Structure formats: structure tokens, C-alpha cells
A protein has these predicted regions:
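Topology signature of small-to-medium multi-pass alpha-helical membrane proteins
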Residues: 5-192
Length: 192
């Protein structure tokens, strides 16, 4: 649900007097690993997509566990407000889990049809986050900002999955091993 970048932004913007150790080099390490694997079929930005997908699972689990009391009906003024809260959170969580499942299967199956399904799941997740934003704006204004941690990154990943040359070669034409040489020419080795 929440992307890796979104969690970093959220962590950076939180104002707490408590000392919280951070690891600012995490994004640099992710970039180094993903860039270093750019000649692999699942490398470069595509590997970074999976990096944020699985780190998003860890962050979502951590946020869910630390805020589990938010899902208890007794913490709300009325039953209607509790149902609105569930309507604003559960669909986005469910679409994220579906995206995680489809993305994981896509790693081994690598078919164009499954990629199209992944795109539709991301579209549904964005739509759910937009509906969640509308509900939150009316009933839970403190939660509105969190929805943009889903809408913005997922929109960017959707654009990537729609336009990427790598994605087309890996999932549609299945010729990445040939295409990689024109996209990322091998560096000539210096004889010693």
C-alpha cells in the first residue's frame, strides 16, 4: 500500500521529540543494486518496482501492527464512522495484497496477459485510494496525506509498466537477452 519512497517521506516529515534511528543510505543501496542488475531481465527500474513492492509489504505490516487499535469498533463515535473508516482503508489494503500476489506470480510466469492484469490491479488500487481520499477528507482529515503515498507512486509505476521498453521485451516479446545488447551495450573489455 505504501511505497518505499512514501515511507521515507513519512518518516522524514514526522515531528517527534524522540530519537528515531534512520538509514538514509537505503535508497542509495537500492539504486546501486537495481542499477547494477540493469542487464538482467528483472533489473533496473523493474527490479526497483519489486523492491518497493516487497518493502511496501513490510512497511504496511509495520503500520498495521502499530495501529491495530484503529481497527477496533469501540474507538469510533458511531458504527457509521467505523464502517466509513473500513471503507477508506480495507479496499486499498486488499488491492495492494492482490498487486503483491499478481506481481509475485509474474516473476515466474512472465506473460503479457498477467502484466495487463497487474496494470488493472494498480488502476483499481489508485481508484480505491482516490475514493479513500474523498472519505478521509470528509471524516478523517488527518489521514488524507497518507492516500497520496499510494496515489502518486502507484501512478508513476503504472506509467512505467505502460511505457517501458524493458517491460515489453521481458513480458511480451520475450527477447530481452537480444534487446539488452542494443539498450545497454556491453562495455568493451580492456586486454592487459
Amino acid at each position: 500500500m505504501y511505497s518505499f519512497f512514501g515511507a521515507v517521506i513519512l518518516a522524514a516529515s514526522s515531528s517527534s521529540s524522540q530519537y528515531t534511528p534512520t538509514f538514509p543510505g537505503g535508497i542509495l543501496i537500492a539504486w546501486l543494486i537495481c542499477n547494477g542488475a540493469k542487464r538482467n531481465p528483472i533489473g533496473g527500474w523493474l527490479l526497483f518496482f519489486y523492491w518497493q513492492l516487497y518493502s511496501g509489504l513490510l512497511i504496511t505490516l509495520a503500520l498495521f501492527v502499530t495501529n491495530i487499535q484503529s481497527y477496533i469498533p469501540e474507538n469510533f463515535d458511531s458504527r457509521e464512522k467505523y464502517l466509513l473508516f473500513l471503507l477508506s482503508t480495507v479496499p486499498t489494503l486488499m488491492f495492494f495484497l492482490i498487486q503483491l500476489a499478481v506481481g509475485t506470480i509474474l516473476l515466474s510466469v512472465r506473460t503479457w496477459d498477467l502484466l495487463k492484469l497487474l496494470r488493472w490491479v494498480i488502476i483499481a488500487e489508485i481508484a480505491a485510494a482516490i475514493v479513500s481520499t474523498a472519505i478521509d477528507a470528509a471524516y478523517f482529515p488527518d489521514n488524507v496525506g497518507l492516500n497520496f503515498l499510494t496515489i502518486v507512486p502507484e501512478s508513476l509505476w503504472l506509467a512505467y509498466l505502460l511505457r517501458s521498453v524493458r517491460v515489453k521485451h521481458v513480458f511480451q516479446t520475450h527477447d530481452w537477452e537480444i534487446a539488452v545488447n542494443s539498450i545497454y551495450p556491453a562495455k568493451p573489455k580492456i586486454a592487459t
